[in-house]
């Protein structure tokens, strides 16, 4: 397996190019280019440009994050979209995603459970109380069978009857018939993460293909649902593959990109990998914003471990404009109230429900 490359400041500064006198942290040429191309013109960075941003030294990190924040404000506005997620069916998945504790193929401590309708409704109500506009129902499956589709139909109808919130879904690889049914049920947005770039995907998953995932996303878009597609950074990919991943997502043009930071799970093949250094994670946020200037870029799993409170604040002022509140699928998040308080401290408004419809 390859390991992530973190290049020293002296090397990355030369690769990125700078303007100014020697010995100073002059603005790198790539950031000057991005200011014109992305901030002023709204055009995303290409692969080579995104790679240069990812190779910037730490001395340019604050300048990168400031530019990414300006891009986010200009092309997305200042509001932050909040979302809650709930696992309808946890554990026992037949797939071998090497990062995932829900795989039934690994000796992980996650046990297989299912929630009932009453639990889903209560979770949706609690999510709505935080100001969140999205509630995503997730199931640990390769793709849904008829029983799961019927459960989804009952759950969606029950939530819609009692809670004023958009419903999203993430239940794996779909057929055209299943896509059409979810659309009819009122699913607002469908999540199916690529997880990593195409070239690294075979190192992460072997039980299904990249093309199966992208095929589902194309059907979702064609059906008129919003596409939510992101992944995990820090799973051993190289910095070049991280740039490739940003462009893979750019080519899909999703509404939302959830950005997870690798959090090693006991019993999985990736259990011994180290989490990303905080500055690498922040640099990734800035680079992804410059490659995806108009997308919702959402803080997802792993931010508590990788970034902490200070890093999360820097991310929200460095390109992030959406967050998952509460817990994740197999890891603890943090109380939603803390995220609401943080947004207030940063003077970032929460996106209203009517702004998402």
From Swiss-Prot:
GO terms for molecular function: 2 iron, 2 sulfur cluster binding; 4 iron, 4 sulfur cluster binding; biotin synthase activity; iron ion binding. [4Fe-4S] cluster binds at residues 93, 97, 100. Residues 9-27 have a biased composition (Low complexity). It comes from the Bacteria. Its cofactor is [4Fe-4S] cluster; [2Fe-2S] cluster. Disulfide bonds: none annotated. SUPFAM superfamilies: Radical SAM enzymes. HAMAP family: BioB. This is Biotin synthase. The lineage of its organism: Bacteria, Bacillati, Actinomycetota, Actinomycetes, Mycobacteriales.
């Amino acid at each position: 397996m390859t390991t992530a490359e973190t290049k020293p400041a002296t090397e990355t500064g030369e690769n990125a190019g700078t303007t100014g006198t020697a010995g100073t942290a002059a603005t790198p040429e790539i950031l000057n280019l991005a200011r014109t191309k992305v901030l002023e013109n709204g055009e995303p960075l290409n692969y080579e440009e995104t790679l240069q941003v990812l190779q910037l030294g730490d001395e340019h990190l604050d300048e990168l994050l400031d530019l990414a924040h300006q891009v986010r404000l200009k092309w997305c506005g200042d509001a932050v979209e909040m979302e809650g997620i709930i696992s309808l069916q946890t554990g026992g998945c037949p797939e071998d995603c090497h990062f995932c504790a829900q795989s039934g193929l690994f000796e992980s401590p996650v046990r297989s459970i299912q929630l009932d309708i009453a639990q889903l409704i209560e979770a949706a109500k609690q999510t709505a109380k935080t100001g969140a506009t999205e509630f995503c129902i997730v199931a640990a499956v390769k793709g849904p069978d008829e029983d799961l589709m019927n459960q989804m139909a009952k759950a969606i109808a029950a939530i819609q009857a009692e809670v004023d919130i958009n419903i999203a879904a993430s239940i794996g690889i779909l057929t055209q018939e299943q896509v059409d049914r979810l659309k009819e049920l009122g699913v607002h947005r469908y999540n199916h993460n690529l997880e990593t770039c195409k070239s690294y995907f075979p190192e992460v998953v072997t039980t299904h293909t990249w093309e199966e995932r992208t095929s589902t996303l194309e059907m979702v878009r064609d059906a008129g649902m919003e596409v939510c597609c992101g992944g995990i950074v820090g799973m051993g990919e190289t910095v070049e593959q991280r740039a490739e991943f940003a462009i893979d997502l750019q080519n899909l043009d999703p509404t939302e990109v959830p950005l997870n930071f690798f959090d090693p799970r006991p019993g999985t093949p990736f259990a011994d990998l180290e989490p990303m250094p905080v500055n690498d994670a922040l640099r990734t946020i800035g680079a992804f914003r410059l490659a995806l200037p108009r997308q919702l870029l959402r803080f997802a799993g792993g931010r508590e471990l990788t970034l902490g409170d200070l890093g999360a604040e820097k991310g929200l002022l460095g390109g992030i404009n959406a967050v998952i509140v509460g817990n994740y699928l197999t890891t603890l998040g943090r109380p939603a109230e803390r995220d609401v308080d943080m947004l207030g401290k940063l003077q970032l408004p929460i996106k209203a429900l009517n702004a998402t419809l």
